[in-house]
């Protein structure tokens, strides 16, 4: 059963976790429970209106050291010199880049696709979150996946996306391709496409390479995004499904509302997810 934020805060064990997390996420985590099989990360797109120098202190406040970086602002510039400076900044601050994107493959040519793989390789990132590869582009992309040993996680974009509204539309087109070609499930876009997100996780299984987490008050309204825990997203069931398939990747918060002041919603979202994991008997 899904916990609302109110029910979550009324639960004695979870209330203790949330009470400590909401006002001061920089406080040390508790050491009770088993290590969590669900690993939380952050989409840098959440902080798209902030520079890297502004974002890094936010991540430290959140005690978050895993980042899905995008070329928004100066988060992960395409220019090689600027990109190297960004990677050095993250490394110096203990932040690991586990995914890049969303990255778009707008040209079906070797030169254009190689440029994207080189960009990600320079940063030492193992996963590309791909926004728009077409079925016709995938065989060419597969060639570079094999050459660079970098995974491609195709990101679904809901009912507006004529190619990949949900992960279930991606699977038929990658069947039989290199196992490093898979999905990034965006939970909000998935439910808006009318797909059961928990079922989708089980169906995608070993081809799931990244997750974008958000919450909605209406599964038919793109504009209804709220902090995780304030909507209808079945967060605990999602975490249970990820645990069941032994998902090795990250659940990256993509908080797209209040772009000029995202931290209140981000703090509430991270606190809620950490509290759910505590309630499942885990420590992050």
Please place each PLM-identified region on the residue numbering.
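Short, mixed-charge, low-aromatic patches
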Residues: 40-46, 69-73, 94-98, 124-131, ...
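Active-site beta-loop-alpha junctions enriched in small/polar residues
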Residues: 43-47, 70-74, 102-105, 133, ...
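A generic hydrophobic-segment detector
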Residues: 149-172
């Amino acid at each position: 059963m899904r916990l609302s934020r109110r029910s979550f805060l009324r639960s004695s064990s979870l209330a203790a976790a949330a009470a400590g997390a909401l006002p001061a996420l920089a406080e040390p985590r508790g050491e009770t429970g088993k290590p969590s099989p669900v690993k939380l990360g952050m989409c840098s797109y959440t902080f798209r209106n902030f520079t890297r120098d502004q974002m890094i202190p936010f991540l430290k406040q959140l005690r978050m050291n895993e980042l899905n970086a995008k070329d928004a602002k100066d988060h992960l510039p395409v220019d090689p010199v600027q990109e190297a400076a960004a990677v050095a900044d993250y490394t110096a601050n203990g932040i690991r880049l586990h995914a890049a994107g969303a990255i778009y493959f707008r040209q079906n040519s070797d030169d254009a696709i190689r440029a994207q793989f080189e960009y990600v390789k320079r940063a030492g990132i193992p996963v590309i979150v791909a926004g728009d590869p077409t079925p016709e582009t995938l065989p060419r992309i597969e060639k570079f996946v094999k050459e660079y040993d970098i995974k491609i996680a195709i990101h679904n974009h809901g009912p507006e996306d004529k190619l990949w509204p949900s992960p279930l539309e991606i699977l038929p087109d990658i069947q039989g391709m290199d196992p490093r070609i898979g999905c990034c499930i965006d939970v909000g876009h998935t439910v808006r496409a009318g797909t059961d997100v928990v079922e989708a996780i089980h169906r995608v299984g070993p081809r799931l390479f990244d997750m974008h987490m958000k919450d909605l008050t209406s599964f038919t309204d793109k504009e209804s995004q709220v902090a995780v825990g304030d909507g209808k997203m079945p967060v605990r069931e999602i975490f249970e499904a990820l645990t069941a398939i032994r998902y090795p990747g990250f659940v990256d918060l993509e908080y797209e509302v209040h772009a000029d002041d995202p931290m209140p919603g981000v703090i509430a979202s991270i606190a809620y997810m950490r509290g759910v994991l505590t309630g499942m008997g885990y420590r992050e």
